[in-house]
């Protein structure tokens, strides 16, 4: 399969309108843009076809167990040692890393923000990242950071890789084209894309929006994988065949370019004379992918009670403690509500985990007002949360007939570590000072006498 990034610098590069992908999660893929570019029967021949260089990209230690051992072999125009020169310091002041204990006056509490404002200035994807929370420690490769992004300009001659973690990108407004070393992916709202740790990429705009906006989970820990299904069995939730990895593509461009690097929480930049996206063929299991959230097959209660939200886990990044995630990516998709004699929305809750929520589309069933597409809520560990007063009244008194919860897609980045709010988030103009008032109408009903009140 052949997709070649050309030297075109506009946002619609001259590649096939319909990009090609390989289905599967964690597969050992192989793909080449030119016939015979991929060596057969070995990884590192004395001389590669087409004058290419062989290079391995490792996503795990060499001695990791086979089931978690990840690496890919890349056959490229230049080796990666030519894609960096002497580094100089770079500044992205709004992109923070854990631990980030910013000095601000915002006290502890349940928090909610409206959508990110539209920028007045020109911003690329890298320029437009704004960190809302951090958790854990980037130096020990534990925890995560939750970001929002808003941009209106392409990365043309700018490229980046993140040595601190993998990037899970969740578009909310505007489709994006993600060029990586290993291929091209077009990603629209209601899809996600994952860029592995250390992989070179750039992000371009698709379509004619005024602004491109979304969310990012920067996972410092073990990489995202599919959760175990347990008694659910072999099917449902996120099925492996619905994950799409791009076929090989390369950009043969000789022009001044900049490579931006995030390493141990700091940023650096280096200048080179060519595109680093020059992989002509590759094989392996360390690769980017995209996933359409609309293909998630939810399970739920079909008689009574509301199940735990863990049944909506798309991806999980585990820790050494079984069942305790460094970070989970959870969605709340369209689904049927059929439980009898049951309060159907999510129940009131205090949790050891810390929950960062966003809304891609529609309305969230536990919050009918205030939580809007592009917005954010943060419920840190052991802080109570649950349906607002109007949602409680509606769910407590509605007829319990089958109802389809439709035209909605909320998500959650949930971590075992407390999420520290950044100074930027604490002072953001869209912070809703009246959020706690959504529970003010939940009055005492108990009077000591038996009966349903």
Curated annotation (Swiss-Prot):
The active site is at residue 306. Homogentisate binds at residues 364, 385. Its EC number is 1.13.11.5. GO terms for biological process: L-phenylalanine catabolic process; tyrosine catabolic process. Transmembrane segments: none annotated. Pathway: Amino-acid degradation; L-phenylalanine degradation; acetoacetate and fumarate from L-phenylalanine: step 4/6. GO terms for cellular component: cytoplasm. Keywords: Dioxygenase, Iron, Metal-binding, Oxidoreductase, Phenylalanine catabolism, Tyrosine catabolism. It catalyses: homogentisate + O2 = 4-maleylacetoacetate + H(+). It holds the Pfam family HgmA_C. Involved in the catabolism of homogentisate (2,5-dihydroxyphenylacetate or 2,5-OH-PhAc), a central intermediate in the degradation of phenylalanine and tyrosine. Catalyzes the oxidative ring cleavage of the aromatic ring of homogentisate to yield maleylacetoacetate. Hexamer; dimer of trimers. This is Homogentisate 1,2-dioxygenase. It comes from Rhizobium rhizogenes (strain K84 / ATCC BAA-868) (Agrobacterium radiobacter). The gene is hmgA.
